[in-house]
Amino acid sequence: MSPLHRQNFRFFHRLRVRWADVDMQKIVFNAHYLTYFDTAMGDYWRALALPYDSTLQALGGDLYVKKATIEYHASAQMDDQLEVALQCQRIGTSSMTFKGAIFRGEDCLISCELIYVFADPTTQTSKPVPPALRDILLAFEAGEPMATVEVGAWQALQSEASQVRAEVFVKEQRIPIALEQDAADATAVHAVARNRLGVAVATGRLVPHAPGVGRIGRMAVNRVLRGTQLGGEVLHALMAAAEQRGDHTVILHAQQTAQGFYARHGFTTQGASFEEAGIVHIEMVHPLVPSL
């Protein structure tokens, strides 16, 4: 394998070399590079908008490494910022071949080839790669979006939105279901993001707050897929809906842990923090330019 180039890849996983990764030669211990690629593979699935465990269960199989080949071109050192790149290069009947590279800036330090086999998790015998998974991998490498956002009424989106919200707010954050659900759902504008398997993975809603002011809330993203673009896509879909109906401003009550997310999307804080449903929140605001 010769060194690879950044422009060959769509997917990058970023990391910094830790002290624990470095050996007595003051370079990354060779075996850790496979761990870097394996960690990046988890992020690759996030980029596909597919929660790994539930997706593979639904597809009736799992992925097993058949072969891993690594070639070392140069060494990474303590505190280096690295980017681990992956690309699905070939899909056979039951196997998938990925090529990978680890970059420091423009320099390719490591290149690799990973071969996975799709197999029955009980018998560990190979099975054909499901057509739906094949299509998703090909679409991702072709640069296509991995999720779509539908904006609509509660009547159309209730089942999917409720499922995502229950997982996040009721099960994960232990908010009583009586507080999570309210009468505003019936008249709110809702948004649901679905992956390419048609599974709802993120949601949010928009309700009137005051004349010309909309309030976004019930923002929830599948736990495994946080840190991707799904939350931002739902947020901007709701902001667009607010603009279209003539709102000049949107506000929201951000959980303190999500304040940075909303700030990156142009929201600013106003007022003091407060507690809501037992969780610290802060009000945030974003001006809009209503559509004419």
PLM-predicted stretches and their roles:
Residues 113, 192, 199-208, 212-220:
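Conserved beta-strand in the GNAT
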Residues 117-120, 219-226:
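A short, internal acetyl-CoA/4′-phosphopantetheine-binding micro-motif in the GNAT/acyltransferase core
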Residues 235, 242-255:
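Conserved GNAT acetyl-CoA-binding A-motif
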Residues 2-7, 11-13, 72, 76-81, ...:
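HotDog/MaoC-like acyl-thioester-processing domains
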Residues 2-67, 120-143:
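Hot-dog-fold acyl-thioester-processing enzymes
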